[in-house]
Design a protein with these regions (language model features):
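Non-heme di-metal
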Residues: 2-346
């Protein structure tokens, strides 16, 4: 057994946090959701549309990562908790895909962007292996978990937004806070808390940031409605979005802090803040008992002990450079695919 996670108690369980898979009954009507559903602002709406698509792809990858970790966890309670995380992520992707169909009906290049995002994640595994993928997922969960906490702390962000989308994002934020420690604890069981494990976490965060600074902005740029394309070059057009994400009360400021704290050898997300008060405040407002789903843990621990962590060295720098080059080439192809798709639509 590793890292003080006992056979019966996980850090989430110690705090009374139960990770519950849920399937909400949200419906998204393409005829009632306006194109500019986020306060009528094109830049902000487009950013959240791209985040929905990119997030859905990421969650599919997190599901695979969680399953990969479960195969290496010889602890039933921790394996169950990780499986609950996996189920939540799968349902998140499923619900967001319902909204994505509205975006497809609006003529946005959703499927092309999904394929692009999926390929970027695949490059990480092809070049650097699944432990690196899991480190990227770990960093992603810490970023998204803190993002969710900030949303729950500032619900006024969604004032004047379409109600179905407000419900979607607030429910999603709640569950991200609820399971924020789950992937971390599974990852730590498998990889440990050595100096090399810490370095792997940090490099995973570097991969995540390097990916996000290209993949999300290019998604925002290409998801703009045709009628607003000419406005994209004006800095003032982006000011509301920049203020929302990075201003004095920006939604991403806490996420940056969490990623920075991954440098700590003994990092744990619960050291950043106590999630109990905000979960207790929002649980009855954002979830319903009839949404809850149960499952049986089928198998776990069959590959325990097969993960060996090497020290980060020059070969890892080379892999990162190869990854960045692959991302740039795939981004060029993505832009070409979007242009071709829009030209075909225009000719139709």
């Amino acid at each position: 057994m590793k890292n003080n996670i006992s056979n019966t108690i996980t850090p989430s369980m110690e705090r009374g946090i139960k990770i519950i898979p849920r399937v909400p009954d949200f419906k998204f009507d393409k005829n009632s959701i306006p194109k500019l559903w986020f306060s009528g602002d094109t830049g902000i709406t487009t950013a959240w549309n791209a985040l929905s698509i990119m997030g859905g792809v990421a969650e599919i990858r997190f599901v695979k990562t969680g399953q990969w970790l479960i195969d290496r966890i010889n602890d039933e309670e921790l394996a169950k908790e990780t499986q609950s995380f996996v189920q939540q992520e799968a349902f998140h992707s499923m619900i967001h895909s319902k909204f994505d169909r509205v975006l497809i009906a609006q003529g946005l290049p959703v499927k092309i962007y999904q394929e692009y995002c999926s390929d970027i994640f695949s490059y990480i595994e092809e070049i650097s292996g699944h432990s690196m993928v899991s480190a990227v997922a770990l960093a992603g969960e810490q970023m998204i978990g803190e993002f969710g906490h900030t949303l729950l702390d500032n619900p006024e962000v969604f004032d004047n937004t379409s109600e179905p989308l407000r419900k979607l994002w607030m429910w999603h934020a709640f569950e991200e806070v609820e399971h924020q420690a789950a992937l971390h604890d599974a990852w730590t069981y498998v990889h440990g808390q050595s100096k090399d494990a810490r370095n792997l976490r940090v490099v995973g965060a570097v991969y995540l940031i390097a990916m996000l600074v290209i993949v999300w902005p290019i998604g925002i740029w290409t998801m703009h409605p045709k009628e607003s394309k000419h406005k994209r070059l004006a800095l003032k057009f982006w000011k509301p979005l920049i203020q929302q994400l990075f201003g004095s009360k920006g939604l991403m400021r806490g996420s940056g802090k969490n990623l920075w704290n991954l440098i700590r050898k003994d990092f744990h997300p619960f050291d950043m803040y106590d999630p109990i008060p905000i979960l207790n405040h929002w649980r009855s407002k954002l979830t319903k008992p009839e949404w809850e789903k149960s499952f049986k843990l089928k198998d776990y621990g069959k590959n325990e002990g097969d993960v060996k962590i090497s020290s980060i060295g020059l070969s890892d720098i080379n892999k990162f450079v190869r990854f960045q080059w692959a991302v740039l080439l795939r981004t060029k192809k993505f832009i070409s695919e979007v242009r071709s798709s829009r030209n075909n639509i225009a000719k139709a």
